[in-house]
């Protein structure tokens, strides 16, 4: 579904996002390799699939580190992609324009 999200954004005229780009904090430590990223704008786009409780906790810690490093994190689900695709691309577009 990450690929589907990327294709949706590109087909809606948004710039091509980086895929699984390693992001580091100010000390050079790896924070995350998000699904999609616009590094210059410090925008991270994540697809949330079916997860277990342990991975939710890890995702939350990673999101907190990204926010602490100055990234804006947008999260989407399969329902968003399948039922509200225009809302997904509109939100990413607004974030890129901010």
Predicted feature locations:
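Surface segments flanking catalytic/ligand-binding clefts of nucleic-acid enzymes
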Residues: 1-98
């Amino acid at each position: 579904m990450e690929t589907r999200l990327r294709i949706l954004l590109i087909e809606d005229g948004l710039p091509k996002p980086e895929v699984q780009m390693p992001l580091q904090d100010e000390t050079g430590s790896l924070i995350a390799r998000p699904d999609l990223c616009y590094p210059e704008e410090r925008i991270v786009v994540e697809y949330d699939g079916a997860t277990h409780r342990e991975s939710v906790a890890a995702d939350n810690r990673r999101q907190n580190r990204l926010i602490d490093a100055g990234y804006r994190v947008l999260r989407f689900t399969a329902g968003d992609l399948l039922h509200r695709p225009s809302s997904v691309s509109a939100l990413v577009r607004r974030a890129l324009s901010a």
